[in-house]
Amino acid sequence: MVKMDNIERNGNVISMDCYEEGDLNRRHHVIFDVSTLEIKNQAVNNVYTRQGIWRIHNIMKESPELPKRASSYWC
């Protein structure tokens, strides 16, 4: 599970904070390209950040409006 907070879009780039398992002590600030989904900063590239990016990508397919917060769960 990953929780995303402070989701903001600036042109072709989205930034957000990803929290592994919702743990505030396991925060990763991620900046990624909307078109390529490529991480643009030195964020940890792990299953949590990738899942967060994928979730935001799917939200954008449904609506042009991004939420300020989102979550993604998997088994």
Describe the residue ranges of each PLM region.
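N-terminal start-of-chain detector that recognizes signal peptides
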Residues: 1-5, 43-46
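N-terminal acidic leader/helix
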Residues: 2-33
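Acidic, low-complexity intrinsically disordered segments
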Residues: 25-75
